[in-house]
Every structure is written in structure tokens, then in C-alpha cells.
Amino acid sequence: MTIDIITLTAKQYAALSAEQLDKVRAAQLKKEHLRIYKRELADMAKIGLPSGLQGSLFSISNVLVQSAINGFGQSVMAANTIASQYDNLTYQAMYGISLSSTVFVSQNYGAKKFDRVKKSAYTALGLTTVIGLVLGGLLALLARPLCSFITDSEEVVGYAHTRMLIISITYFLCGLQEVFAYCLRGLGKSMTAMFVVLGGTCLFRILWLNTVLKAWNTLTSLYLLYPASWLLTTLIFVPIYFVCQKKAGKLLEENN
């Protein structure tokens, strides 16, 4: 009896092994399949290249802004570094939401579930706003004690406090800007998102440095550059996104 059970078990194991081997053979890598697929490459480049170019050009405006900050002295430079570390906590929380919105929007768009496309975008916008306002508000409220953990200089703490009062409270605008950009990429409009960010953020900041900051050369006017650029970019994104979303919905209806 025991021998029969062992024999039956061995046969079942052999059958399962053969089945798994068939699956492996079906998924095996063949030399003739190792080639460039033009359509897939074009789709990846259409989405990836604008994002990469945007990041590169964005760095140029950041260098110019950092140069302007450095012009206010060592204490301001130190304060900016400290405040940036705390603001990065808010940014990373919002960035996670905005990045995931691309996945949800693109997958539901590909699955032709347009209601979920809209729900994904609206949920991401709502979550980002709440996270940005709550975390940003807390950081602005606790700016002085938080910065005191890092430095004993009252001057540096004061400069950091000034920055966080202006930027931390309005950081949710940066999150909204990111969500709109990533949702547009999810709809296949990566180039559109790139041009909006480059114009509303990068170009605007360069113009601000050469006009507003030169007329009012104060730390406050320099830091106001950030919320002003986020607000402008978000306001540009709003009509563009909803027009693109509406067109995407009509396209899905026509193809059904």
C-alpha cells in the first residue's frame, strides 16, 4: 500500500514537472526575438524623453535660483538648506501620490474605464491638497523649534523660519502641479506636460529673477518666486488637463 502511494505521488510530481517545463518553453527567450521594436520604442520615447528633458532644463532654473540665494550670504544659504530638508518631507509625501496617479490614470485609460480615470485624478488632487496643507502648515507652525534642532544660530533659524512661512504653507500648490503633470502623462500627453512646466515654472522663475528680484532685492521677494510659479503652472494646467481628459473620454466612446 505504501509503495502504491509513493508511486502515485511520483507520477503526479512528474506530471506537474512536465507541465511546468512546457510553460517555461512557452516563455523562453529566442535569439530572433532580440531586436528593436519600433512602435514600442516610439511609445517609450514619447513619454520618457520629454520627462528627461524637463528635468534637465528644470535644473538650469534651480541653479539660477540657488545662485540668487547664495548672494544673500552664508546664513541665508545655511537656512535655506535646513528649511529645504523639512520641506522635502512634504514634497516626498505629495510626490508619492502624484507618481501613483500616472499608474492609475494610464492603466484605467488603457482598460477603457474612463470613470476610474477621472476618479484617480480627482482623488490624487484631493489627497495632495490635504497632505500639502496639513504637513506644510505643521512645518510652518513648528519652524523655529524644528530648525533649532539643527543649528544654534538665531540668525539662521530666523531666515529658515521666513522661508518656511512662505514656502511650506503654499507647498500644496507644487503638489497640485505635479499631479496634473503626471495625470497628463498617464493620458499620453507627456509633451504637453513638459511645455507647461517649462513655461510656467522654469521660464517664469528666470523672468522673476531678472525683473521682480532686481526691483525688490529682498529675501521675501526671492522666496515668493516659488508659490508664484506653482500657482501660475497649476492655473495653466487646469484648463489644459480637463480639455485633454474630455478628449480622451470622447476617444474611448468612439472606439467602443
Q: Language-model segments: which ranges?
A:
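Short alpha-helical transmembrane segments in multi-pass integral membrane proteins
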Residues: 11-49, 105-170, 212-256
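Hydrophobic faces of transmembrane alpha-helices in multi-pass small-molecule transporters and flippases
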Residues: 33-64, 69, 89, 93, ...
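Transmembrane alpha-helix boundary and packing residues in multipass membrane permease domains
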Residues: 51, 55, 63, 67, ...
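Helix-terminus/linker motif at the lipid-water interface of multi-pass membrane proteins
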Residues: 56-89, 107, 145-154, 213-216
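Residue-level signal for transmembrane alpha-helical positions in Major Facilitator Superfamily
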Residues: 57, 61, 97-101, 138-142, ...
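Structural signal for membrane-spanning alpha-helices in multi-pass inner-membrane proteins
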Residues: 66, 95, 139, 182, ...
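Small-residue-rich hydrophobic transmembrane alpha-helices
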Residues: 79-143, 174-197
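Transmembrane alpha-helical core residues of multi-pass small-molecule transporters
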Residues: 87, 131, 199-204, 229-233
